[in-house]
Every structure is written in C-alpha cells, then in structure tokens.
Amino acid sequence: MSHTAKTILVTGATGRQGGAVAARLLADGVPVRALTRDDSSAKARALAEAGAEVVVGDLDDRDSLDRATAGAWGVFSVHAGAYEGGPYGHDLDHESRTAAKLGAAAKAAGVEHLVHSSTIGVGGPLEEHMDMLQRKAEAERAIRGSGVPHTILRPTSFMENTFDSFRELQNGALVSLLAADTYEPHIAADDIAAFAAIAFADPGAHAGKVYELAGDDITQAEKAAIIGRVVGREVPYVAIGVEQVAEDSPSTAKMLGVLNEHRMAVDIPALKKIHPGLLTLEEWMTGIGKPLVDAYFARIDAA
C-alpha cells in the first residue's frame, strides 16, 4: 500500500480536539485529510483554506471511511459518545461501533499508525462506577482489536470548556457540580494536539502507549481563584449539590458523587518530559486561551 506523503486522516476535524490536531499537523507541514459530515460549514471551509484536504464522511458509514482512509499513513480517531441530551441520544453502542468501523477501515487501508482520543478514568477504579467510562473502554478495545499500531490519549477536562460550551462560568461566578475541594485535572486542546503530533512523528516510541493527559490539577476553589487573579476581578465559587441534579439526571448525579470521592491523579511531570510546553490553566488563560477568556468577560460586561 502506497501512502500519500504520510497523509494523516483527522476525524472530528471541525470539533474541539480534531480541529486542534488538524491545525497542529498543518503547522508542522504534515498533509492533513479532514473528515467532516458537512464540507460547506465555516470550519470545514477554513480547514480547506489552511491547506487541508476536506473529505465528506460519517464515522458510522464504513464505505465513507474506506474512501477517507485510502492512501492515508495515519489516523487521528475521536468519537462522540451517547449521553443525556447529546446528539446520539441513548445509542450507547455508537462510540464503540464507530471506533470499530474506523479501525477496520484503517487496517484495510494499511494505515501505519492511529492515535485514538479516549478519556481519563478508563481502566481505573472509576470505570466500574461510570457508564461513560465503560463505553470509552469499549471503544479503546475496538481500536486495540483493529490490529493497527496505535497510541491512546486519555485527556482530562478541557480548559476551553470553562469559558465556552459547558458554561461553568455564569454571570462571572464559577458554578460547579463538584465540591470546592475536589481536584479536577485540566488540559488544553492544543496540548492534546501536541501529544498526537508527537506520537505521529515518532510512532515507534509511542506505539502501544497510553497517556493520561493534563497540564494542571486543581481544586474547584483554586480554579476560581486562578480565574479571578488572571482577569483582575473576584470570581466567586458556587457549588451545586449533587442532590439538586439527581431528579433530572440520575446518571449525572451518580457520576458527580464518584468524582467527589475519587481523585483522578495524572503524572504531569512525566508528561512534561515528553511535551515540555504543557500548559497550566493560568498559562493557557494568559496565552493561547486569552481571546476566549476576553470574549467571555466582554459578554458579561455588556449584559
């Protein structure tokens, strides 16, 4: 099987992780084939303008995956899971099914290395308590069973989500379902992309490896203090008790109870030996994350 200049297929290319990986690889001069369900979207057009080959496909459609992986040297694999209110509803097999289809297509195409993004907690004591982790574990097993050389990344909470989609900040306060003294590891999407690029650049050193990714490990109270220090204003911490969400979402309440009781530790010093530029939350907020932070507080001030 001949490969086109070590082209890497990036799934989820218009999303948080896939978009960061595509941008990082393009910046490194790596040919990128970006998979999207809609090549007319603004993000897809931006990828094309940045130099990516944009292809239309669906992770649940094996034929489209065969076309997308043809001639690719590598694949970045990221899959949306099923959760309450999510796009796949209660299709609990979606993640493992699409991972299996992608792995099979990659194997058939002769892909030489696959980097799969999962989540922290898989394979640990939390897995038996959390359905989401069990589904992530099933997806990992599908990738391992594909026979394609691979690296698995297990990122923690995205720093970007604090100021964006998860709306943890509400009216200038940090509103959290976790207790004030509960530790929560965080990672920047750009650092996930950096680890993916490192694995693709030296697959021999990273094949078969699993990396749990975080650049910072802080309590909710510390997080509020860091945000307040960076933006120069008081950011109160407001806790939402588990009992307040139990009626509407029992699964979320169960997950929060487990997270409040079990710390998810990450070996950040070991990660920095691989990627010395790993960012803390404060470094991210004052650096590449500053536009997102500024935009959030500008909206607060304008309200």
What are these regions (language model features)?
Residues 2-46, 60-63, 67-72, 80-96, ...:
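Oxidoreductase cofactor-interface core, primarily capturing Rossmann-like NAD(P)-dependent enzymes
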Residues 24, 206, 230-231, 242-303:
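A hydrophobic C-terminal alpha-helical subdomain
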Residues 51-53, 150:
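Short, conserved active-site loop motifs that form the nucleotide-linked donor/cofactor pocket
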Residues 79, 118, 239, 262-264:
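Short secondary-structure boundary segments
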